[in-house]
């Protein structure tokens, strides 16, 4: 139970003070109530060891590898047809139910920031466990609990939910493309994901203008996974629905063909549930349910509350004549009947065949003496109304084998899109084929450089005449594309040498090209001189160059470096897919692509969270990168030092100097001038990103640590550690 209101009317006395006990620790008016616009640093301390019961020594990959996957899959398959009295299976098969669970686990993914998806098992927690679109999926997870209980730590909930969906498809006669484990559970709700600003379920303030959807959102309404199946805001207009479908699925990384395959394939199975009006019969969602419900929600008082009386979406009916078996009947029905608008018993808009056609062809889910006509939703008819979708749908109808392959591949992409590179995939069912959306990186096929080689290469890099700024900037630009959300980006693959990254404005393409050309010369010269198959990749050289820059700036420190990166090819790089990794802002380089409604400091925290940084790591990196002159276009904003290119704590010392007074120098209050408090002489200029480390109380507390007279050594040590972390975020081979 998450709605922890005490139902007891009588008030006891506090055993310590004797007063009435009204609230416990953590209750009361919070900082966020007083100052709702305060910077939210809590997203930088998610999923810490304090909330993880497994302990830091636990290795999920090792645990998964000890799993008997074949036996587990058999147990899941046996469950499919083992109908439980407390939640009877439609058509005697839980397969469609588990497909919906898996789909809704993975379907929250959005490509813009890589957040959402199945990767952490978030469907277990609010808000997802209580979204209107996830109604009754609490029962699906409860059905799986005996299996999770049996296999324990060897299988995460995140993996189990997706595997159950795969097993469901296979149990009903469909051949899947494969399955990979490797999704490690977290133990608390995600605070970093922006689901929208609406305060009411199914509201859609996320739209503006000509139905322009707010970034990074993908779903059309608060609490939905994709689109409204009845049509935009319940308007049963198939063509308007197609527009929503296209944008939503594209924002979830699906093209038109994949979209049609997923809709047609997914709706081949199961049915919708709307036996009666949910407003009259269905009670609170899990997060608001009473404590005795033990995590379950949506209690239904209509009839038996389950089986033929189930109320979920409010829509009612099945699409095909064999809802628990793979077939091509969905497309056959979609084009084989003409459809007219009707309403479900719950009052929801849906479609039935005209003139009573199709009557008696669809079995009842629970009563063998009943039968029905097929049902379509507005979102289904969009596949006929939209000319592009219709062409694809008819092609699939005429070419069943092509449809099956398209659905298998699209389902695999849907359920694995947020897992990152194949190096993270676990298990015997991992497909051998490497797919372009997995951002493939060649395997290491050469002997790696050793310490002596590294010393030689460092000397060559220094001899090339790069400035500290050029060396550090290039390495940062390469590595900082990483997103901990969907594990994309990073230095491995050296895609900074390829389109589109090499041309991004934030990377200063002219300067970048100069550095990369020189590094390629060093690479060719070194590799040609080797006689035993030893090679160095550009990816490794770029990171090593950053290490050289920091060592030059810090004088007496060795920056860790681990070779083993390889170089991707342009043909292994989907330009459109990688375009979403281009930073809208990078506060570490004091870069803003344009003016946004979101503040620069909020975008900094967002970027830091995607880089999996803590608040101390964020702070020390900002301080170090500023004095190393890594700013976009060599801007002097935030360069609070007279020793540019030296790794000092000057940024913090000078920011915290009360002898400086700050005033906005632009109407938008994004640039500030720091002047001598007594003379008015201009000393520094800074951005909101710079000044937030003196303004925000938490960040100021951290800045003070590094601004003390005895902190220089700690500052350098902490900076190098945080730097090394960023350089290796995508080195899954080292985990």
Swiss-Prot record:
Domain of life, per lineage: Bacteria
Gene3D superfamilies, A to Z: 1.10.520.10, Peroxidase, domain 2
One BP annotation, GO: cellular response to hydrogen peroxide
Cofactors, names only: heme b
GO cellular component, one term: cytosol
Cross-referenced InterPro entries: Catalase_peroxidase, Haem_peroxidase, Haem_peroxidase_sf, Peroxidases_AS, Peroxidases_heam-ligand_BS
Function: Bifunctional enzyme with both catalase and broad-spectrum peroxidase activity.
Record-given protein name: Catalase-peroxidase
Species annotation: Flavobacterium psychrophilum (strain ATCC 49511 / DSM 21280 / CIP 103535 / JIP02/86)
């Amino acid at each position: 139970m998450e709605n922890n209101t005490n139902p007891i009317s009588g008030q006891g006395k506090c055993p310590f003070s004797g007063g009435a006990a009204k609230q416990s620790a953590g209750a009361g008016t919070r900082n966020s109530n007083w100052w709702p616009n305060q910077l939210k640093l809590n997203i930088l301390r998610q999923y810490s060891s304090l909330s993880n019961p497994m302990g830091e020594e636990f290795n999920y990959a090792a645990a998964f590898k000890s799993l008997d996957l074949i036996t587990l899959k058999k147990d899941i398959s046996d469950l499919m047809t083992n109908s439980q009295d407390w939640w009877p299976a439609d058509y005697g098969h839980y397969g469609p139910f588990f497909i919906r669970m898996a789909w809704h686990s993975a379907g929250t993914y959005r490509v813009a920031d890589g957040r959402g998806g199945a990767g952490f098992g978030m469907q277990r927690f609010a808000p997802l466990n209580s979204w209107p679109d996830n109604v009754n999926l609490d029962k699906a997870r409860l059905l799986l609990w005996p299996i999770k209980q049996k296999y324990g730590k060897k299988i995460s909930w995140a993996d189990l939910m997706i595997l159950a969906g795969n097993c469901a498809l296979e149990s009903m006669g469909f051949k899947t493309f494969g399955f990979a484990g490797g999704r490690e559970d977290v133990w608390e709700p995600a605070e970093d994901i922006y689901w929208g600003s609406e305060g009411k379920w199914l509201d859609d303030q996320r739209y503006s203008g000509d139905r322009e959807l707010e970034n990074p959102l993908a779903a059309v309404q608060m609490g939905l996974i994709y689109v409204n199946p009845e049509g935009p805001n319940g308007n049963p207009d198939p063509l308007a629905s197609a527009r929503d479908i296209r944008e939503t699925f594209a924002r979830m990384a699906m093209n038109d063909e994949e979209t049609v395959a997923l809709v047609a394939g997914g709706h081949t199975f199961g049915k919708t549930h709307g036996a009666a009006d949910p407003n009259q019969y269905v009670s609170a969602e899990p997060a608001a349910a009473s404590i005795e419900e033990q995590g379950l929600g949506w209690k239904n008082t209509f009839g038996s509350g389950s089986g033929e009386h189930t109320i979920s979406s409010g829509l009612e009916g099945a699409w095909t004549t064999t809802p628990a078996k793979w077939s091509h009947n969905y497309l056959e029905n979609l084009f084989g009947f003409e459809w007219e608008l009707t309403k479900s018993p719950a009052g929801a808009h849906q479609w039935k065949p005209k003139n009573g056609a199709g009557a008696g062809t669809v079995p009842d889910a629970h009563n063998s003496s009943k039968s029905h006509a097929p049902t379509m939703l507005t979102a289904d008819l969009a596949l006929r109304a939209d000319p592009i979708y219709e062409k694809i749908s008819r092609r699939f109808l005429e070419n069943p084998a092509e449809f099956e392959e398209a659905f298998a591949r699209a389902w695999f992409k849907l359920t694995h899109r947020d897992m990152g590179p194949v190096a993270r995939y676990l298990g015997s069912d991992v497909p051998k084929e490497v797919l372009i959306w997995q951002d493939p990186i060649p395997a290491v096929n050469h002997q790696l450089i050793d310490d002596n080689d590294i010393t030689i290469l460092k000397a060559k890099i220094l001899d090339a005449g790069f400035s500290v700024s050029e060396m550090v900037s290039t390495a940062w630009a390469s590595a900082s594309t990483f997103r901990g959300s969907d594990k994309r980006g990073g230095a491995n693959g050296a895609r900074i040498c390829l389109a589109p990254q090499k041309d991004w404005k934030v990377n200063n393409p002219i300067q970048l090209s100069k550095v990369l050309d020189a590094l390629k010369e060093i690479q060719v010269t070194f590799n040609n001189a080797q006689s035993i198959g030893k090679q160095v990749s550009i990816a490794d050289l770029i990171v090593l160059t950053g290490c050289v820059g920091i060592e030059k700036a810090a004088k007496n420190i060795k920056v860790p470096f681990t070779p083993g990166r390889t170089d991707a090819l342009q043909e292994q790089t989907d330009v459109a897919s990688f375009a979403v990794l281009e930073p809208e802002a990078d506060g570490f380089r004091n870069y803003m692509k344009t003016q946004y409604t979101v503040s620069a400091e909020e975008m900094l925290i967002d970027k830091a969270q995607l880089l999996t940084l803590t608040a101390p790591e964020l702070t020390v990196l900002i301080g170090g990168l500023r004095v190393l002159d890594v700013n976009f276009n060599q801007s002097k904003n935030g360069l609070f030092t007279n020793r540019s290119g030296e790794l000092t704590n000057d940024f913090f010392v000078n920011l915290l100097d009360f002898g400086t007074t700050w005033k906005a120098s632009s109407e938008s209050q994004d640039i500030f001038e720091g002047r001598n408090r007594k003379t008015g002489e201009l000393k520094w200029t800074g951005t909101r990103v710079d000044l937030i480390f003196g303004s925000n109380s938490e960040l100021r507390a951290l800045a003070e640590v590094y601004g003390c007279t005895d902190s220089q050594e700690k500052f350098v040590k902490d900076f190098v550690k945080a730097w090394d972390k960023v350089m290796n975020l995508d080195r899954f081979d080292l985990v």
